[in-house]
């Protein structure tokens, strides 16, 4: 007979076992989207089910202008699990690529010079420019996150750090492409 097939959940649990065994510093990047939400919940469930006595770092880049339902979801998950999460909610005016302006190549969330038109206030407990000595005005959002990873590793005095990012690799595999070209 053939091998017993494992499902995605079982394989994820095996990987989490290795991660939580091998790394002293684990950080999940959580945008509030489906992929990062599933990953964060898998980690939360793993910690609780295995009764681990450690906290999980969560890195959330708060872009100021987000759907209210996404903000509510992020707030709800972080609050409900604050006993096991060490949250780094980042509200920094790094550069962010934009395609909504003919005049600007980028915009800045939480730009202090534009405070009068902010969509909302900085959430309580968020980390701002003052918390990050490596931040510069020239920094792009993804450049910031690379520096953040090094900063967190040093701050935690970690031996081995693991940064988890939930990204779908295959979507909608049940759909089929038409066999004849469209006319």
What are these regions (language model features)?
Residues 1-181:
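ATP-dependent adenylation/nucleotidyltransferase module used to activate substrates
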